[in-house]
């Protein structure tokens, strides 16, 4: 099998597995969504990175000496239906790179990243994120059993907090903005001040 060093060597209509993904050696960053290649947005702008940095700082301090581990992008997360047990690379068809994620089960961590659903995922929207892309991620995280999912809206300086209910469906638990204090459902001791999250944010 020839080395895949350019994205143009792949058929974007084809279905691929995580085993295929591991062999790719091109520069573009992609995610794999149910076997289909999804191109990620170009390198995040400075405002996106400032928000990610601020969230990282708060979460790093909180999780530093705890069982749950905190990871920023780039970090591969392999997802599949939560009713299934751990799968082999050839049977996994979804790989994403959330902006930030928290994982409490050490058994799903390996050298490649995370093999299963993180407990908490934070995604920071960029102008390059399409509405369809965000709908796909929402459904994907819900299906795979990500317990808590935050969407950060930089331009609105807002956060939407979703939590899985007993039926495995996301419920919008909180819509916060500007100088509100937001508390993760899974980690009530962690208070996130949005004024600090969006500190130094400058509208483009």
Q: For each predicted feature, which ranges?
A:
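Gly/Pro/Ser/Thr-rich low-complexity, intrinsically disordered segments predominantly at protein N-termini
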Residues: 1-204
